[in-house]
Design a protein with these regions (language model features):
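Short beta-strand His + acidic residue motifs that chelate non-heme Fe in jelly-roll/DSBH
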Residues: 45-47, 65-66, 91-98
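Tryptophan (W) side chains
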Residues: 4-5
Length: 110
């Protein structure tokens, strides 16, 4: 992946075992990069490390399985519209762990 993924470093060159989430860049300027992610059930982002602080706002209710370094996993459910913020440096793979499509908008702070 290239272009808007410039701030995200994929952790492995291995092909993903699951379908890939669809990423649609909405804004990319000097201050922010805004990307919408749409996941079919079971789809994933692939392992990556965030190069910038970011805010996530779910468009739908999101049932996520987060794969983390060292083999740890976390299941989280985030209601539509409930935003959260993370610092740069987060490494993970985000998977739609639900039975329905899920979507969120990511705002990266430059």
């Amino acid at each position: 992946m290239t272009g808007w993924w410039a701030s995200i470093t994929l952790s492995s060159g291995d092909p993903m075992a699951r379908p890939e989430a669809k990423a649609t860049q909405m804004v990319d300027d000097a201050k922010v990069r805004v990307t919408r992610f749409d996941f079919a059930p079971g789809a994933e982002t692939g392992w990556h490390t965030h190069g910038m602080d970011y805010v996530i706002t779910p468009v739908t209710d999101c049932e996520m399985l987060l794969e983390e370094p060292g083999g740890a996993t976390r299941r989280v459910t985030i209601p539509a519209g409930e935003s959260y913020r993370r610092d740069a440096g987060v490494e993970h793979n985000v998977i739609n762990d639900g039975d329905a499509p899920m979507s969120f908008v990511e705002v990266e702070l430059k």
